[in-house]
Amino acid sequence: MTTMVNVDTLPEYEKSQIKRALELGTVMTVFSARKSTPERRTVQMIMETRQVAWSKTADKIEGFLDIMEIKEIRPGKNSKDFERAKAVRHKADCCFTIFYGTQFVLSTLSLATDSKEDAVKWLSGLKILHQEAMNASTPTMIESWLRKQIYSVDQTRRNSISLRELKTILPLVNFKVSGIKFLKDKLVEIGAQKDELSFEQFHLFYKKLMFEQQKSILDEFKKDSSVFILGNTDRPDASAVYLQDFQRFLLHEQQELWAQDLNKVRERMTKFIDDTMRETAEPFLFVDEFLTYLFSRENSIWDEKYDAVDMQDMNNPLSHYWISSSHNTYLTGDQLRSESSTEAYIRCLRAGCRCIELDCWDGPDGKPIIYHGWTRTTKIKFDDVVQAIRDHAFVTSSFPVILSIEEHCSVEQQRHMAKVFKEVLGDLLLTKPTEASADQLPSPSQLREKIIIKHKKLGPRGDVDVNVEDKKDEHKTQGELYMWDSIDQKWTRHYCAIADAKLSFSDDIEQTVEEDPVQDTPPTELHFGEKWFHKKVESRTSAEKLLQEYCAETGAKDGTFLVRESETFPNDYTLSFWRSGRVQHCRIRSTMEGGVMKYYLTDNLTFNSIYALIQHYREAHLRCAEFELRLTDPVPNPNPHESKPWYYDRLSRGEAEDMLMRIPRDGAFLIRKREGTDSYAITFRARGKVKHCRINRDGRHFVLGTSAYFESLVELVSYYEKHALYRKMRLRYPVTPELLERYNMERDINSLYDVSRMYVDPSEINPSMPQRTVKALYDYKAKRSDELTFCRGALIHNVSKEPGGWWKGDYGTRIQQYFPSNYVEDISAGDAEEMEKQIIEDNPLGSLCRGILDLNTYNVVKAPQGKNQKAFVFILEPKKQGDPPVEFATDRVEELFEWFQSIREITWKIDTKENNMKYWERNQSIAIELSDLVVYCKPTSKTKDHLENPDFREIRSFVETKADSIVRQKPVDLLRYNQKGLTRVYPKGQRVDSSNYDPFRLWLCGSQMVALNFQTPDKYMQMNHALFSLNGRTGYVLQPESMRSEKYDPMPPESQRKILMTLTVKVLGARHLPKLGRSIACPFVEVEICGAEYDSNKFKTTVVNDNGLSPVWAPTQEKVTFEIYDPNLAFLRFLVYEEDMFSDPNFLAHATYPIKGIKSGFRSVPLKNGYSEDIELASLLVFCEMRPVLESEEELYSSCRQLRRRQEELNNQLFLYDTHQNLRGANRDALVKEFNVNENQLRLYQEKCNRRLREKRVSNSRFYS
């Protein structure tokens, strides 16, 4: 196998030679997961964009990957891509695989060179270039990004971009162009000629655009509190920041101690200077360069000292650490049908995870397999997993790895497991205690590069501690069934499970493998679906008008064309195209040859179809006596929707709603022409509700929302059939007369598919709770007489959500007055969602459940002859007269028998509990060879609820619900136990979607291994990633010393809590936010403190419309101050959302940090995607100030808290008096008086706190100046 050269020792000239070789390219064999046959391609490095590209021909790149996204370069034939092409023989030392991507499941590029020397060269070169890319300065990254934009529109890698291409690019990077005049004016400013920009001009255009959009942020440096005062900021070069000013800024505003060295300050400045003439002993930054620095990762909010490992912290007992832990590590997705993969183990281990789970089952040939038992998840070999663990366990972190074994294997296969552990892991496997007489766990340092087995262990007499209660429900009937769909008249596959005499089923499993065979389209019809085919255009003049309008808008490119049916000759067509500023027409003639229709423009060249003819002349020139020309851009047909079954030209809103209400399926839809306007509406069903969304016309485009542009309604529908339109709903069922007629025949089907019947309407449970209630996230002081003033935590009732970011509501004595919507959160919807969660809490399918059948209300019968082309069918016949039967089918007779017996036992009231117990009693044997490998992590179950007298050699595992119960009832006992013993907490079985629970309260009580689903990009996994970013991402973080104090209480009563710090945050702007779909983002930011319940708080900014490239909040956004009780155990979290066309928030990016690791000042917040992977150039700019609370100030903050609580009580009492007439009484005036007095007092307290902060900043700035 090829070994990688140590590139750090190579001299610079050798590195340059290697990079030059990669840039020239190498012909290699490319292995693909999607193609069974390897292909020869030229693979080369594009230095300007930092991308690896592969191509068949020089002018057409087939694919590329960003070098910054590379996670691993693996030598040899160590990927599945090579296994799929076993017939192709390549030496292992010529092969390697690049693993890359920003999701949990990585993409692969598997390559084979023709020589070992080439392989070594590429392995070394990629490592050199990856290091350079990861250390590149922000200006270098910007230049690379700009190159990518140019190359994305022209793969020839030319050094310029046209006005038309620029207009295309800007919406793709999240910026809405107001019109072509806006761009032309910008081109004049930068001196571009003839609507064409060189790369240097494109770079200048970018700099001017970003500066003009965000220059208002620099007003922050014109205030008295600033440590230096900026001059004119109207233009990028209007004023400058000089060396001494920059040093003062770094030292006193940013509190950067390294800035005491002027040489380091000078070096930092020169990275951001765009003109080498200014790289002198006294450099200066123009104001646009200073603004770029503020947004740069060099100015990050994260303190880099926490990227280093603190070896002094690694000598405590293992029980004193939080340990990064994974649940069901082998899965890449949900718990029902996702793929199991050894790569998932590798991904977790290389991400620093130190406790991984192996779910072991008996496999073929006497060798165990790993998968999620009784589900459709794929199976992987135990031996392969152990090999992967050995190879990757200590790449990222050298500290111990714990293997948590979920054992389901027979004794014989357990012996094989023990054999593989010993043979493969060798000296890495811990087989005896580090100290024979120790009374506590060893430290991570003592266990470096050791692998610990967590598994049941035989006692002195051969008995084993097995908790039968934990296992008794595990053997249940679950799996895939076909259900007969009476609407679509077909079988659909669902994941089903039986529990508590109920059969729960998931949504239908979309066919990904057994797709319907593609119907061959006759050659004469191939052109029907092409955008250039316009069918029968009214007249020649109409065709000319279409071409003229399109060319006027897009730049009049010769060869722009459309095809239409001939007005004069049957079976013939007309090709209309643009040449030299006018429209020309050619007749496409047809003729019969041997019974086959042929089409031609010239007699000597005929084609079998119109499609083939057009494709030919798009690649070859159309030659005439007067000219020769190649067809270029097609003019899209503006009205292809008129022939679609989902389109209705004359349909009112009410009629559309009536039609949709009769189709009880999410994803049912139609599009209708709106009356009296040149606009349309899409009416669809989602979450059981019928919704409408307007589609406007903008020139030839159709616009959904404000910035999702489509060439046609057909393109719009096609797009949203593949992508979510509303939340997770995609368009699936066109509402046609045939579908409505079929539904009328099956009118009772709603009783089965109306999923909302699973949930209880919140209004039925709590009718006294007013509708549309919101909760204040922060204090707000009215600035006008028609606005509300309220404190944090206030409940505002009867809210009217009006457009423009200002809502109306009732608070205290003020009725229907305005307040900013970003200061509140909607708790009505939150309560409903929480209720829904509680109702599905015990459902075996959890949130994936789409329906429940109560088996006590059905009789089960077999269909001996099968039904609807399925041989193995059983039917649930309702006991209630008039209800519809439900038909199920299986693929095998054995499955039919198992499901039939399970349901019949329930319907016959057979108690199977005793049988299950016996099943598990027969299966609790442990192989002594495997038992002997267990040293420190012996699970205990029988007495695990008793937390006294912990044994450091044991580990106690709790499902999240049990752990939550312990935390609520005896948090101190759990904390004391964890000071000596180990606990592991794992998600409940109902989390079949692989969602995660909140780990914070468990961390607070000292639980070391809080196992989460690493493959799920949710809030709690992001918090986990933030916690373990400490201590050099080793996977071990030492718990605060205060947690080991006898006086420490993880859940102290309110009287014992003290505010230790205030954190002031102001969101100023953002750059390069990611783009989700067709629409340009309308972003807003949520700032949240995550911690114990008393430390949790959040705040939202306003929404910026149609700008995800350079949004600004600085002029309107106020500073927000959070009170922190425990800075060691709290997180600062920035969430960036976009508000979609339905006013729903959609996640864009996040940044989550332990508060102890953040820095003060004007700081860049580099943004990450859901998987906590960096997003190129995406960042927020925030002002952040941390300030310890003095003892003299604690009384002031305590008074504020007490007043806020009292105001909440008074507000709710006043609301009852206002809404329930019979409750009015004499006490109301007293309540109003107390409410108003408290409100004034609270405002005075808050102003006093803010004044102290301002005085401190101003005095500091004067001192520094």
Curated annotation (Swiss-Prot):
The lineage of its organism: Eukaryota, Metazoa, Chordata, Craniata, Vertebrata. Residues 312-456 form the PI-PLC X-box domain. Keywords: Calcium, Hydrolase, Lipid degradation, Lipid metabolism, Membrane, Phosphoprotein, Repeat, SH2 domain, SH3 domain, Transducer. The gene is Plcg2. It comes from the Eukaryota. The modification Phosphotyrosine is found at Y753, Y759, Y1197, Y1217, Y1245. It catalyses: a 1,2-diacyl-sn-glycero-3-phospho-(1D-myo-inositol-4,5-bisphosphate) + H2O = 1D-myo-inositol 1,4,5-trisphosphate + a 1,2-diacyl-sn-glycerol + H(+). Its cofactor is Ca(2+). It comes from Rattus norvegicus. This is 1-phosphatidylinositol 4,5-bisphosphate phosphodiesterase gamma-2. Its main location: membrane.
